[in-house]
Amino acid sequence: MTRDLLTTKEVAEYLRVNPYTIYRLVSQKKLPAFKVGSQWRFERSVLDRWLKNQLNIPPAN
């Protein structure tokens, strides 16, 4: 199983926010991410779950 990993820039485009907003959310531990070397990476499935939680969307059955 491969994980679909996104860069900070890709997450910013996906969420339609400035990349600095992504860095701020990560530094405040409000957005799930991990580092590969010096670069932040985001797992798409984790990001989608986080987004649904932020929007209070109930999970699909």
Predicted stretch roles:
Residues 1-21:
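Polyanion-binding surface elements
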Residues 10, 19, 36, 53-54:
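N-terminal cationic leader/targeting segments used for protein routing and processing
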Residues 15-41:
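Major-groove DNA-recognition helix of helix-turn-helix-type DNA-binding domains
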Residues 47-61:
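A short, Lys/Arg-enriched interface patch at domain edges and termini
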